[in-house]
Amino acid sequence: YGLTPGIEMTTGPLGQGFASAIGFAYGERFQRGLLDPETPKEDSPFYHKIWAICGEGDIEEGISGEAASLAANQKLGNLTVIFDANRIQIEGDTNLVLAEDVLKRFQAYGWYTDEFSFIQPDGSYKEDIEGLADVIAKAEKAAPDQPKLIKVHSLIAWPTPGKTNDPSSHGSKLGTEAVAGLKEALGYDPEENFHVDEEALAHARKVAERGLEAHKEWDEKFDAWRKANPDKAALYDRLKAGELPEGFDKALDDLEATFEVGKGVATRGASGSVLNAIAAVMPELWGGSADLGGSNKTDLK
C-alpha cells in the first residue's frame, strides 16, 4: 500500500487478509447503504463482489474464525473465499496441526460451503478452471445472502519434478534446477528466461480491453447516479476528498458547553457523548464493539 496504484491495504500476519476481505465486503454494503440505498443492488454503481483466496495457514488463525462468524451473522452474501487446500505446511502434512473439518466449521458459522478437486479420481491432476467456475456459479445462485467458502483440493508446486506436493515447496524457493524442470514439464525451453507466450500476451490484452469496456459502463452508471442524487454526490465528493463535514467543530463546541467544570464524568461516558455528537453531522461514522455498546458507550443513537 502506498507504493503501487490500486492496492488499498497491505496485510501482514496470516488470517489478517481473510479478515480484511470481510471488512471490504462489510464496507461495500455500508457505502451502498449510505450513498445509494433505494437502488436495487445489482443496478447500483456502488455494488460489487469481494473475492478472496486463502490457504490453510489463514484458516488456522483465530482472527479468521472471529471474522467468519461476523460475516455470517451480517449475511455478507457479496463475499466468496476460495480456500486453496493443498495440505502442505513447512513441517509436513497440515493434518499434523489442522484436525477439524473446516467446511463443517464454516457451516456452523452460517457460511455456504462447497468443494472441488483438481486431483482426479485416478490420481492424475488437472486444474479444471471451468469446473471450478461452475461450482462458484452454483454457490452464487444457491446462497445470495450467505458468505461462501469454496474448498479447492490442489497440489503445491505442480508439475515441478521432485517438488510437487513436497513441504520444501512451501517455505523455500524452488531453485534453478527445479525451475528448469518445471519449464520443461510445461513445454518451455528450460534455458529461456523472462519469456511470455504470445497466447498469454493476447489473453492479457483481451482482459485489459474487457476491463476498459466494463469501466466505461460503470462510468455511465455512476454519472447517471450523480445527476439523480446531487446531495449524495456532494457527500461522495467530500468523502473522497477526506474532508470533515460542515458543523463538525460546532458539534464538539456545543458538546463541550454541556460539561460542567469540576464535575467528574466517566471516560467511556465522555467518549460516547463525543461519538454521538460527531455522528449527528458525520453520517459516514461507523463503529461498534461486539456486544458491549451499553457498557463502553460506543452505540450511536
Put a short name on every predicted segment.
Residues 1-51, 213-301:
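Thiamine diphosphate
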Residues 3, 7-206:
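Glycine-rich ThDP/TPP pyrophosphate-binding loop and its adjacent helix/strand module
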Residues 210:
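Active-site neighborhoods and metal-handling regions in enzymes and metal-associated proteins
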